[in-house]
Amino acid sequence: MTPKPEGHVASYLERRKFLATLGGAVAWPLAARAQQPAMPVIGVLDSVSVDFGIRNLPAFRQSLGEEGYVEGQNVAIEYRWAEGRYDRLPELAAYLVRRRVSVIVANSTPASLAAKAATSTIPIVFGVGDDPVKLGLVASLGRPGGNATGVNFFVGELAAKRLGLLRELVPSAARVAVLVNPSDPVRTASNLGDVEAAARAIGLQIQVLKASTIGEIDTAFATLARERADALFVTPDSFFNSRRVQLAILTARHTFPAAFGQRDFVEVGGLMSYGTNLADARRQIGAYTGRILKGVKPADLPVVQSSTFELVINLATVRALGLTAPPNFLARADEVIE
């Protein structure tokens, strides 16, 4: 029997109605998903190499998690590493601004200055070893104003302490070489001023050595070997952090007692370090980042003055250099690496 035309039309219309209903059922969750707020993005801007920078990321992620933000679940993080090349920082900061990240975490003085120059609206949480007021990052420590706040590491006060500890290990030292990175003139001037003042106070002469490339580090050590200073003071610097293995090898090869700012150098064979506990500083930065993601303004968060410092000494290196670590020195150490 030939079906009636009207029955065919009715069947066709029913199929259309079913498909329309199905299409609406599929489209509804897609539309609802599109209406959900976008996942916030944190932009991490760092001067160091990846292998150095990732060492303290667990502390940052932990405190961020305590504020309710878990990477990959309800927050995304984009990492940009300058690998010790400060000239790359402006473009890396500009990328994060173009990416429209929710907040920029800047983990060094050069990175913080690059971030501040790139935006006056995106919140910035910094970690710096210099006075953030003098750097122009904030109006004051208690009332930052603007779009930036963070953690200050007290580098100036640490220089005198670090130099004094080096003198305890090498009491016969009369002249100390100071290694600085000229590609960061602001930090170099600050570091040199602090070390010169500390050296005068304890009767030490200093010799300045400059290096901003791998080759220049080798050249600096050749000069050091030729002129034979009694010890070496390596100023805190992101490029030097990235070259910590090279520096530890060279100090061992030339038998130079050397003082560093971070424990990472001592873990790869350096003699001693005294400085900020970077993991603790990253925890503080993570906490501030989480609060800003919740809507707190950087201007309302006072700059945190880092107060957790650590002395680390490598006893194997002490012996290899023919030195003796006094018992009271070892007693003050937060960690002794055998």
What are these regions (language model features)?
Residues M1-E338:
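Short hydrophobic alpha-helices and adjacent helix-cap/hinge residues
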